[in-house]
Amino acid sequence: MVSPETSSSHYQSSPMAKYAGTRTRPVVCISDVVLFLGGAFMSLILVWSFFSFSSISPNLTVKNEESSNKCSSGIDMSQDPTDPVYYDDPDLTYTIEKPVKNWDEKRRRWLNLHPSFIPGAENRTVMVTGSQSAPCKNPIGDHLLLRFFKNKVDYCRIHGHDIFYSNALLHPKMNSYWAKLPAVKAAMIAHPEAEWIWWVDSDALFTDMDFTPPWRRYKEHNLVVHGWPGVIYNDRSWTALNAGVFLIRNCQWSMELIDTWTGMGPVSPEYAKWGQIQRSIFKDKLFPESDDQTALLYLLYKHREVYYPKIYLEGDFYFEGYWLEIVPGLSNVTERYLEMEREDATLRRRHAEKVSERYAAFREERFLKGERGGKGSKRRPFVTHFTGCQPCSGDHNKMYDGDTCWNGMIKAINFADNQVMRKYGFVHSDLGKTSPLQPVPFDYPDEPW
């Protein structure tokens, strides 16, 4: 991103008063003394009055219109110059049918006209998620999706991300797993201030509310997904990556990727053919239709020189992790983290939610430095993905017995919720029970229940 030119501001001051002249008489008369003392007394009264008003209670501070429209980070949300930008171009559309050209230049111009958004723009992120437009068939489906969404809202609030939730198709043909691409493109255009768009499936859950992605690692990349190069190029497996959670940079490269990616979806006249092509390469693909995940795999496999240099396949931690691998060990993870807190009083200290990242950084340095976040790690799993569970329809994979999916979801949701509600003084004492919560003792967990 090219930073705009900055101009320095100058404070100009002028004298408050000028000498009217100097006295020439060698002797000071009594009247002059009286006048001098009276003037000094009045000056003291004025100074006292000034400090009395300036030290008024902060609870009575008067807000002006300008300051009330600015957030604490200095972003001015009330300023939008009349200079023409891409929003004023009638040929630019948010839909997937028409490509967006010169997006980097368009976005740079918008930022230059809105300079208050430039500080912090390097990793500013908007999370995008969504679900179906109709009520769930599963009797508890809507409740589960609500709690999954609450989890994402909690994570975004803690880390300062914006979030956009879509529960409607933005293209009539792009449904199911393809619905994410129109939503992501629309979010890129709607949020030029954001460097990253973070797609998270409705059935994916943040189970480490402290962890943040290693942004520096992705500096030279435009797309981050959970995956493994060897499984793509050697095994040619359909499960070599998971497209249910990804970070995509808000840039022209990404716009073009979405156009190409979409070209293998239901809007393509060759949609049926693409499914056959994908299955001819990735032979463990379970169903004949072209899907977004295998389409991305196809691009990486067939056009490696074009896409692989800019796509980071994250395998060092659970960028999204298979729930059946994670949920059985959540109780052990809870105990490991409680042990850290028993060992160090800093982690037991009660604190405001707004400073949570400070305590997360302390835990990282004290206990987790150098610890990877995959299977068997001391870390909490970052994102737990309930693939195959279908919480809305209820038609989960037949390999999962009975209520395994729903019980696992409740346990993982409460595990994550404990990390949030602890800041509010309450926790789920039993991960299998959502309500009521228990108040946390003062020095918990060093002080017993």
UniProtKB/Swiss-Prot annotation:
A GO MF term: transcription cis-regulatory region binding
InterPro entries: Glyco_trans_34 (IPR008630), Nucleotide-diphossugar_trans (IPR029044)
GO BP term, pick one: seed coat development
Topological domains, Cytoplasmic: 1-32
One of the Pfam families matching this protein, by short name: Glyco_transf_34
Recorded topology in the membrane: Single-pass type II membrane protein
EC number of the protein: 2.4.-.-
Transmembrane segments: 33-53
Subcellular location: Golgi apparatus membrane
Enzyme class: transferase
Gene3D superfamilies, per the entry: Spore Coat Polysaccharide Biosynthesis Protein SpsA, Chain A (3.90.550.10)
GO cellular component: endosome; Golgi apparatus; Golgi membrane; trans-Golgi network
Keyword Glycosyltransferase on entry: yes
Keyword Signal: no
Sugar-modified residues: N59, N123, N332
Topology Lumenal: residue spans: 54-449
Entry keywords, A to Z: Glycoprotein, Glycosyltransferase, Golgi apparatus, Membrane, Signal-anchor, Transferase, Transmembrane, Transmembrane helix
Function summary: Probable glycosyltransferase that may be involved in the biosynthesis of xyloglucan.
Family membership noted in the UniProt record: Belongs to the glycosyltransferase 34 family.
Name the record gives this protein: Putative glycosyltransferase 7
Organism: Arabidopsis thaliana
Lineage: Eukaryota, Viridiplantae, Streptophyta, Embryophyta, Tracheophyta
